[in-house]
Amino acid sequence: MNRFRKMVTVVTALFAMQAAMAQDDVQITFDKLPAKAQSFVKTHFPKEEVASVWKDIEIEMLRVEDYTVALSNGTKVEFLPNGEWKEIKSRGSEIPASIIPSGIRDYVKKHYASSTIKDIKKKRYGYEVELTGDIDLEFNSKGKFLRVDD
């Protein structure tokens, strides 16, 4: 009987631990973001209020994968664990020009003057940019145009 109780206790503990670890998105406060990410938000979105901040934890590795900051205007900014931004998604408002590399800004202004950048994502090769009108463009790390992504 004693052995049965131990087995039940162990199984119950394992289920409880698994349930606790299954939550991989944890809401945190703004001050828990890496300092570099806090500075980025304050610099480029000074008039926007922070609606929520989330930390995404990789369950298997027990490490932080990224942070997501949702702003009052609907914009979401994803950061790497070191505080570098990796993606910015705008919902109705324009992404601040101060964030976008000048080569990308100039190319979009010249070739897609009536469009605005609604998403920008850092990739290994450079940047992926989505314009209003669902046009996807790719640029190298220096902001030089590579191709239209179909």
Features from the language model and the residues they span:
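Interaction-mediating elements
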Residues: 23-150
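Bacterial Sec-dependent N-terminal signal peptides
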Residues: 1-25, 41
